[in-house]
Amino acid sequence: MSVLVIRASKRFAVRRPVTLHGPGKKRDGLMIELSSEGCRISNAERGLYAIDQEVTLQLDEAEHIPGRVRWAHDGFVGIKFARALRQTELGQLLQTSRAPEYSLAC
């Protein structure tokens, strides 16, 4: 039996290398889903992240987004941003996260 989940924000498929910073931790991952409220990261080390743990998503040298872990299992981590992205921020992030250089690098 499947369960229908209604989401507050539309999700977009992306493919962008990121670094996830937590207390005493810094790990690389791949952002595979993005919304104005948060994102999903794959290639996350199992058992490294706890629900409600504060993290910072590093997109590049200058761009960091604070948030909290909503869930973590099977090498995936769901992050809820500390504040929702504005429409322009989301649009710019989608554009750069779908750029050809990220698709080739992964």
Features from the language model and the residues they span:
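Structured alpha-helical
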Residues: 1-106
